[in-house]
Amino acid sequence: MATDTSQGELVHPKALPLIVGAQLIHADKLGEKVEDNTMPIRRAVNSTRETPPKSKLAEGVEEKPEPDVSSEESISTVEEQENETPPATSSETEQPKGQPENEEKEENKPSEETKKDEKDQSKEKEKKVKKTIPSWATLSASQLARAQKQTPMASSPRPKMDAILTEAIKACFQKSGASVVAIRKYIIHKYPSLELERRGYLLKQALKRELNRGVIKQVKGKGASGSFVVVQKSRKPPQKSRNRKNRSSAVDPEPQVKLEDILPLAFTRLCEPKEASYSLIRKYVSQYYPKLRVDIRPQLLKNALQRAVERGQLEQITGKGASGTFQLKKSGEKPLLGGSLMEYAILSAIAAMNEPKTCSTTALKKYVLENHPGTNSNYQMHLLKKTLQRCEKNGWMEQISGKGFSGTFQLCFPYYPSPGVLFPKKEPDDSKDEDEDEDEDDSSEEDSEDEEPPPKRRLQKKTPVKSPGKAAAMKQRGSKLAPKVPAAQRGKTRPLPKKAPPKAKSPAKKARPSPSVIKKPSGSSSKKPAASVRKEVKLPGKGKSTMKKSFKAKK
């Protein structure tokens, strides 16, 4: 049969479907017999079933057979067989497909596990870095306890190697200095955690470092052998040289300042926008401005805040009235708020208590170059980059955006500087101005007290009638001034009673001034006694003229 089917040219096209159909029927009969016995033969039958349609398709691509009754029957039988066989083939095909899927899953699992292990290792490395609490952080006792639990302080059970070396040299000092052998024994005995027996290079490095600094001096030997002495006078000459340098050119106090200490203040000044709640403002003002007595009189602070909002110096973001959050407004770089002591206190409180404190690296670079330029600007930028990285590792700062030396950083601990630290130039000027104002007020009051009486005296001549309050005040001053004038004029008034007895013609004239002298001190004005004195001064002249007339009459 195979030879007949293979020679397609000899077979008539109409006879081809009949031959194929006969083959299929014969195969079906064989399959029915074998189905009851074993399954493996069925697989072979399936393979034979599948081959004829392939050959049929290969041979009959060009020639399309005409449909006959026999062909229709054969097609129907093929369809029935195909409908019966799929469950077995589907299960068979699923088995080999399922195996590679399982293999792929098994391969993916180890890759995922390796990724997880890498992540865990990176997290462990991050956890291993001990986060410390910075010296500039302003924390209460409860906040400090919480922070210590969350970020345990890096305990330092022993000092640094340089300090240990100087301590050992002083302890082992003799006439010829301290030998390296004695120094080593001392350190091994007192600081066993260093393991100096195994790590002898630590001692050599420390000796070399301290020799270069000039802290110690080598008396005997060379290198890491011999005897050493601590130089005590090395600290005084540099101070003198510094003083001389400062006298000649006072420029180099900056190297002593660390960028780690500068950054928190830079963050507080550069952070924008600055805003704080009423409770924080009140807390800060009551702490640093006790003269305002905000705890006793909170209404003063509330009124000042409301007044600043009405003027446009502050913006109330949340809340109503004096409660809520207030934000500073600026014209350029200068804040609009300022002037009185209360306004200055509110300004410093909002600037200091603003949280969270964030700042961009560009603003930090500009601030450092303007305020702490150093000798080399490029080196200063390098130091700034290193300090930011170190602060981030210690957990003092956090990079919110960007990577490396770009983006924005944020302080992880609260920092509330005092007004003197926040505005060092403004506060002393304000205090001086306040003192000057007080002095001016006192001096003006004293001058007014001294200058007030003369115009009153002039008015007294013009207007004898005065209020009872002024009269009482003038009585006291009149009592002080009255005894002084007669004391100076007593020498001139005394000769009057001596020359009075020979006078006979002028009793009426002399009787007139006596009541005026008695009445004038009892009067309300202080000028009247002075006027009476003037009249008394003129009286001797009149007395002399009368005396001359009396002498002439006697002659």
From Swiss-Prot:
Cystine crosslinks: none
GO annotation, biological process: cellular response to hypoxia; heterochromatin organization; nucleosome assembly; regulation of cell population proliferation; regulation of DNA-templated transcription; regulation of nucleus size
Record field: compositional bias (Basic residues): 233-247, 491-512, 545-555
Keyword Ion transport carried by entry: no
Comp. bias (Low complexity): 513-532
Residue ranges, compositional bias (Basic and acidic residues): 51-67, 100-127
Domain of life of the organism encoding this protein: Eukaryota
Residue numbers of Phosphoserine PTMs: S6, S142, S155, S156, S248, S249, S443, S444, S448
Residue ranges, compositional bias (Acidic residues): 430-452
InterPro entries: Histone_H1/H5_H15 (IPR005818), WH-like_DNA-bd_sf (IPR036388), WH_DNA-bd_sf (IPR036390)
GO annotation, cellular component aspect: chromosome; nuclear speck; nucleosome; nucleus
Location, primary (coarse class): nucleus
Subcellular localization: Nucleus; Chromosome
Crosslink feature (Glycyl lysine isopeptide (Lys-Gly) (interchain with G-Cter in SUMO2)) location: K64, K97, K258
Statement: the UniProt record of this protein carries the keyword Repeat: yes
UniProt keywords, alphabetically: Acetylation, Chromosome, DNA-binding, Isopeptide bond, Nucleus, Phosphoprotein, Repeat, Ubl conjugation
Disordered as annotated region, ranges: 29-134, 227-254, 422-555
Domain H15: 157-232, 255-330, 337-413
Domain notes: A central region that included the first H15 (linker histone H1/H5 globular) domain binds at the entry/exit site of the nucleosomal DNA.
The protein's role, per its UniProt record: Component of heterochromatin that maintains heterochromatin integrity during G1/S progression and regulates the duration of G1 phase to critically influence cell proliferative capacity. May play a role in hypoxia-induced oncogenesis.
Name by which UniProt lists this protein: Heterochromatin protein 1-binding protein 3
Biological classification of the source: Eukaryota, Metazoa, Chordata, Craniata, Vertebrata
